[in-house]
Every structure is written in C-alpha cells, then in structure tokens.
C-alpha cells in the first residue's frame, strides 16, 4: 500500500488488523485507540480531517458488532466530528460505512471541504472524482502539515 504521504507500507493479512497491531504507522500517528477501536487519518488519501474509525476485531459488516460496540463506535464518530467542527476544520461531513467483501469494516468521516464542491457538486454521487482529485493534487508538504496538525488536535482532545 502507498500511504497518503506517498510512502510504501508493508503489512501481512488484513490491513486494519495490522494497523491495530501496530505493524505499521502513519506519519501523523494514530489519533486515538482503545481496546476495541482505532481512529486515524485515512491511510491513503491526503485529505485533511478525513478520519477512519475501525474496530480492532476483524469483522466485515456493521451487524457483526455488538450493540455496545456500535454505540461506542458512533460515540467516537460523533466526538471526532465535534472536535473537527470546534477547531474549524470543516462544518459538514459525510459519514460512510465501508463493508467491502473480504475486508474489515470501517467508517469514513469525510469532511466536505469547499474544494470538493468545485470538483464534484454532488459529492456522494461523485466520490471517486473527489478521491482522484485528492490523490492527484493534494500530495503536498502543506497538506501533510495540515494532516499532522489536525491529528494532533484530535489526539489531544481524545486524551483529555
């Protein structure tokens, strides 16, 4: 895998499980983790404020979580969005569940930055265009610095 900072990352097996076991790290580090979940900047896409919440348990569907796990996962999503809003990272977000075949369930917390509206007026219908734009135009030192700063804010707020 190539991470958002254009670095090659090696791991074995399921990438979410490998990340939870700390087999690889992101340049910005993990924003938050507990016994059941990880929260981090998206690994591959250089979009400031684009976070991923993933269970540490290897499951591939939302229904595979217990009610307690679902409640906790949504609390992490809600808290992350509140932190990002309070720090003026973004005002609006899309929250997407990714249940790919033979892949680990995770939730995308996708900020709706102004540039996205210019690239794709209907962001959820044209998500591929937004992601392609980020990969092509946002791999810059300025973006990496923003990602680091935002991750530090989220980490600090979760650890208070």
Regions found by a protein language model. Name each.
Residues 1-160:
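HIT superfamily nucleotide-processing domains
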């Amino acid at each position: 895998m190539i991470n958002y900072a254009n670095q090659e990352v090696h791991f074995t097996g399921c990438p979410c499980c490998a990340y939870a076991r700390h087999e690889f790290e992101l340049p910005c580090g993990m924003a938050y983790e507990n016994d059941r979940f990880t929260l981090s900047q998206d690994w591959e896409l250089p979009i400031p404020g684009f976070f991923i919440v993933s269970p540490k348990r290897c499951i591939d569907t939302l229904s595979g979580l217990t009610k307690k796990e679902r409640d906790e996962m949504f609390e992490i999503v809600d808290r992350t969005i509140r932190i990002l809003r309070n720090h003026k990272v973004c005002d609006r977000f899309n929250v997407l569940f990714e249940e790919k075949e033979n892949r680990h369930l995770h939730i995308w917390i996708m900020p709706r930055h102004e540039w996205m509206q210019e690239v794709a007026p209907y962001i959820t219908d044209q998500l591929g265009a937004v992601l392609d734009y980020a990969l092509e135009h946002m791999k810059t030192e300025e973006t990496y610095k923003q990602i680091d700063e935002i991750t530090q804010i989220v980490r600090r707020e979760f650890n208070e």
